[in-house]
Structures are given as C-alpha cells and as structure tokens.
C-alpha cells in the first residue's frame, strides 16, 4: 500500500471517528441503530482495506478479546476483532463492538500483554459507548450520510469533500480533542482494572504508550493533531504511570505470560504485510542479538515463513524443524509444517500431518481449512466439502471458505450453488455489487436448494435494509 493510500485510509477512518463524536444534544444512538451503522462500516472496511482473516489470525485475536470480555461482563454486542493491513500505528473501535488493529501497530509490539492492553483499551471505548453517545437522533441521518461519503473518500476520489472535512474539523479542533482526551482517560482506567483482574501485567500499557509517544513525535510534523484518533500520549503516559505507582504492591499477583502464540501470530501478520527483505533482516538481527529466549527462537519461525513465501521450501522446512525442536508440544507448528508441504505440492505428506493435527485439536480452524484444501487438491471433494462446511459454521464471515465451496460446486457442474457461494465470497470481500448479482441469480435458480435460496433472499433483504437506513 502506498504512503498516499495509507494516509487516505487513515484520514477516512479518523473522520469516521470524529463524525460519530459530535457532542450530545438530546438522545444517544440506540443499540439497534448503532448495530446497523456498525454493519455498514464493516462492509466499507472490507471494501477499502485488506482484512487479514486467515483462521489462525482471526481465532487468536478473537480469543484474546474474549478473555478480556470475560472480566468486562455482559455486553450489548457480539464483539468482533480484526487485523487490517496498514503500516499506521493505530487501532480503532467502531460502533457495535467492531475493533480493528492495524498491522503497523502489531509490528511495534513485543509481547502479548501489550496487545491485551490495547484490546482492553478499545473495548473500554465500546463499553463506554464513546462514539454512540455523542450522536443525537436529530443528526442521525446526516451522520449516516457522512459515513457513506467517507466510504467514497476511501476509494481515492475525495474531491471537494476532503477540503470541506479538513476545514470544518480544524475549526472545531479544541472541543473534539477535549472530549477525546476524556474518553482516552476513561478507556485507560478501565483497561488497567481489567488487566489487573486478568492478572496481566499492566506495565505493558506503559510500554505501549512509550512506543506511541516515540512514533507520534516522529510523525507529528506530517500528521495534524486533529487527524489522530488517540491523541496526547504524553498525558496518557503520565496518568498510567501514576496508576502503576499507586498499585505497585500488587505486582506479585501478575502472571508471567507465555508469548509463543503472540509471537507466532505477529510473524504470520508481518509476513503478509511487510517487505520480506526488511523482515528477513529484522529476524536475523533478533536471532543474533535478542536476549529473550522465546523472541529469539520465534525469529527463526519468521525466517521459515519468509523462505516459504520465496518458494524455498526445503530451507523453510529446515528452519521450522529447528523451531519445532524447541517447542515439541506445539501442535500449531505441525500445521505450519503441513502448510509448507502443501505449498510445495507434497499433498500426501501434508494430509497425514493435518489429519493428525486436526484430530488432536478439532477447534483449530486453520488446520481444518488447510486439510480441506489438501483434500480438494487431491480430488477428495466430498470430504473437502464436509470440512469446509465445518469451517463455515465456525467462521461464517470468512470469505475464502465460500470461494473454495464455490469452486467445488462449479467443478461439479452445479452452477447455481456455485453462484450462491460466490455471492457470499464477494459479500465478505466487500464487493457488494458482485455479491448482489450472484445472490440474485442463485435465488432465481430452481436447481439451488430451497434453504440456499432462502438464505440468499435474507442476505439481499439485509443489504437493502442497511443501505436504506444508513
């Protein structure tokens, strides 16, 4: 993604943050209205940003989010957590429990507690309804229209609108930032308390804010203050440090975190979002110089992923074997081995490993999905379909699973069912026009099973409702 494109996307979603943050005049947005706007935002994000939705990445970030929510308590929304490709150091909480993490933020992290601290902070924004409470019913329609305009900006044709947004928001800079600072303090306070309840080390909040301060200082000359969703890290850092000092006697209750899963997740994200030569250099330096054993070992995992991406499969397997020797009980590394074998076209070896791995952990959707792909490539489409349906039930918004199902049906000559699955694939890829086109065809095709026709009709009706109401 180019620097201009990244800045444009950042501008769009920061404008979204501010657009939903006007001071309350009368009544706050209702839960139903917030959920509807959240759905619209998610479709826009899917269209304009690349979501890293591989099952292992998705399951990890959502599992961590669920751990935080267990101490938060019952919520109005079903929270969903996403990783999006952007080199920006940022995360944001959209309405209705949608929380997005930029890959640039994940790159800056070094341990799981840092990620949990940001997760908890963003959940704090949502539970406090910082966005929804500032939009009154009298401005709901114009704010919803503004969301559509913001989605248009993300397409790269801002025109007059960008100048209009910049000028009007700059004029209201002080009040917008004043409210934002209050929200940040409340979210930090909630995050700190939840981390204590989880026995996580809240010093990670301090570490993240120091990193944010460094990056903000570095970029401040290029990014106006009113374009920052999380302003004033200096004040936040002072506040968090005072909390740490106040609770310093509780440090013995903090549990040491196993960072294996985080480090694996981090490299899985980075290998898809950063320059591979630069990442290789980083891994080599970490392997040679880092004093933390897990960080050093998992740098070799990063090298294995890089070799696999460069189709140096033998070298990748050699690197991974060294990592497996240091973590012999980590089943996910066996899945990673099978994925490299799959990429190399060694399907029989990959299948044997994946069968055993899925048997050990049937909840691992990454292993299950990769096994389905191997079965399909080997001509075992019946079993592949069964496995893919399992993944689809567990991850109903994962687009690639519907693409694979559509391919199977198309190869069987079942074009109607293929169009149905292709419609869902396009839907969750953010390509609404193509989704509607294929779902309409599937709905009219008499060869398509009735339950699929009904689901297509339901999706089309929901899309029409969202577009009409927002």
Predicted ranges, named:
Residues 57-58, 77-80, 135-144, 162-164, ...:
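Acidic/histidine metal-binding catalytic segments
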Residues 140-158, 163-175:
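Membrane-active amphipathic alpha-helices enriched in small hydrophobic residues
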Residues 2-92, 173, 215-220, 282-283, ...:
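Hydrophobic or amphipathic, alpha-helical segments that drive membrane association/targeting
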Residues 27, 39, 51-53, 59, ...:
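Extracytoplasmic and endomembrane cell-envelope/extracellular-matrix remodeling and assembly machinery
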Residues 103-117, 179-182:
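Short pre-active-site segment immediately N-terminal to the catalytic Zn-binding motif
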Residues 113, 123-140:
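Catalytic Zn2+-binding segment of zinc metalloproteases
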Residues 100, 114-122, 126, 166:
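Short alpha-helical catalytic segment bearing the HExxH-like zincin motif
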């Amino acid at each position: 993604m180019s620097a201009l494109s990244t800045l444009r996307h950042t501008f769009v979603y920061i404008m979204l943050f501010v657009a939903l943050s006007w001071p309350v005049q009368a009544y706050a947005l209702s839960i139903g209205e917030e959920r509807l706007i959240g759905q619209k935002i998610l479709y826009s994000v899917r269209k304009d940003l690349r979501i890293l939705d591989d099952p292992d990445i998705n399951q990890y970030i959502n599992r961590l989010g669920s751990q935080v929510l267990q101490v938060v308590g019952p919520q109005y929304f079903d929270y969903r957590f996403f990783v999006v490709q952007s080199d920006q150091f940022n995360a944001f909480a959209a309405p209705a429990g949608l929380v997005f993490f930029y890959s640039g933020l994940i790159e800056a992290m070094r341990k799981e507690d840092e990620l949990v601290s940001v997760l908890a902070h963003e959940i704090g924004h949502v539970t406090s309804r910082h966005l929804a409470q500032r939009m009154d019913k009298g401005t709901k329609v114009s704010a919803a229209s503004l969301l559509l305009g913001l989605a248009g900006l993300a397409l790269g044709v801002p025109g007059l609108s960008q100048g209009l947004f910049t000028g009007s928001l700059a004029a209201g800079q002080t009040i917008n930032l004043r409210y934002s600072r209050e929200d940040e303090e409340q979210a930090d306070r909630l995050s700190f308390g939840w981390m204590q309840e989880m026995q996580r080390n809240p010093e990670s909040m301090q570490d993240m804010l120091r990193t944010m301060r460094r990056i903000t200082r570095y970029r401040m000359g290029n990014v106006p203050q009113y374009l920052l969703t999380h302003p004033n890290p200096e004040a936040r850092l002072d506040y968090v440090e005072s909390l740490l000092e106040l609770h310093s006697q509780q440090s013995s209750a903090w549990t040491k975190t196993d960072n294996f899963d985080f480090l694996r997740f981090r490299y899985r994200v980075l290998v898809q979002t950063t320059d591979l030569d630069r990442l290789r250099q980083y891994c080599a330096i970490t392997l040679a110089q880092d004093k933390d054993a897990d960080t050093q070992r998992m740098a070799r995992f990063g090298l294995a992923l890089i070799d696999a991406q460069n189709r140096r499969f033998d070298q990748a397997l050699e690197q991974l074997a060294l990592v497996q020797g240091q973590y012999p009980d980590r089943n996910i590394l066996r899945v990673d081995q099978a994925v490299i074998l799959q990429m190399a076209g060694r399907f029989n070896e990959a299948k044997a490993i994946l069968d055993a791995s899925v048997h050990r952990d049937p909840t691992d959707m990454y292993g299950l999905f990769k096994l389905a792909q191997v079965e399909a490539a080997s001509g075992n489409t019946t079993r592949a379909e069964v496995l893919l349906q399992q993944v689809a039930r567990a991850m109903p918004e994962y687009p690639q699973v519907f693409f694979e199902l559509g391919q199977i049906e198309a190869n069987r000559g079942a074009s109607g069912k293929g169009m149905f699955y292709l419609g869902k694939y396009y839907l969750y890829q953010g390509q609404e026009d193509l989704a509607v086109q294929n779902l309409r065809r599937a709905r009219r095709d008499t060869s398509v099973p009735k339950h699929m026709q009904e689901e297509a009709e339901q999706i089309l009706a929901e899309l029409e409702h969202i577009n009409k109401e927002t």
